[in-house]
């Protein structure tokens, strides 16, 4: 809600259930107005999850690629969804087949990752880093999973850079919420996590191929992302 429409959440209840059919002035609609763009949502969730299908339509999404459109490989996590590496590989294949981002098409595409949710238990055959026994298990599991997702994103961005349209493409990497949640305070108090785990609930905001180059090391709010991206679209 904040990232796509610049609105603060409700004090109680969920907007996706209570106000999903409101009129929202979103990034998707702004892109359509500026570039006559087509908007895609790619997620391995079902459209019924958090009422994503109805919300996406209200946000101006033209095409939803969801749960039943992906092959269930690398399934893990509480709800047995596909891992982010397989997700991005299949997204790449959909681009190559022309299912999304057709040749000559101006697009707004939103890719929703999944693997970075608790309990952070990555299958052994997908693990590519290890940590010493002194690191608490929950912290090690989280960093292992984060590394897996980071690499999946990196591989996908490397693919995008091979496309001729990349020079006119902005890639935004952002989190909708922080990762450790209730585990954070426990890990912050552990001496082994000093320098690894922050006591602050932070999310990333990275813009690649931006028309304006800068690094901002102070704190900003998620509510600032929407106007920042609107400004970069101009």
Language model segments and positions:
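Solvent-exposed soluble domains appended to multi-pass membrane proteins
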Residues: 1-234
């Amino acid at each position: 809600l904040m990232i796509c429409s610049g609105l603060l959440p409700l004090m109680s209840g969920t907007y996706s259930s209570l106000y999903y059919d409101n009129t929202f002035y979103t990034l998707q609609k702004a892109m359509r107005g500026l570039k006559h763009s087509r908007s895609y949502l790619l997620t391995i969730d079902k459209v019924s999850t958090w009422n994503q299908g109805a919300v996406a339509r209200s946000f101006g999404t033209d095409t939803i690629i969801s749960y039943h459109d992906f092959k269930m490989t690398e399934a893990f996590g509480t709800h047995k969804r596909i891992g982010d590496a397989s997700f991005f590989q299949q997204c790449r294949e959909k681009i190559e087949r022309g299912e999304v981002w057709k040749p000559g098409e101006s697009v707004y595409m939103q890719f929703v990752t999944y693997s970075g949710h608790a309990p952070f238990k990555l299958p052994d055959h997908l693990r590519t880093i290890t940590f010493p026994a002194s690191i608490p298990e929950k912290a090690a599991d989280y960093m292992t999973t984060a590394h897996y997702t980071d690499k999946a994103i990196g591989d996908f961005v490397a693919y995008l850079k091979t496309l001729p349209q990349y020079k006119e493409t902005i890639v935004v990497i952002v989190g909708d919420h922080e990762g450790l949640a209730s585990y954070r305070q426990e890990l912050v108090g552990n001496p082994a996590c000093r320098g690894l785990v922050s006591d602050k609930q932070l999310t990333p905001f990275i813009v690649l191929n931006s028309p304006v180059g800068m690094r901002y090391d102070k704190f900003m709010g998620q509510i600032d992302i929407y106007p920042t991206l609107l400004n970069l679209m101009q």
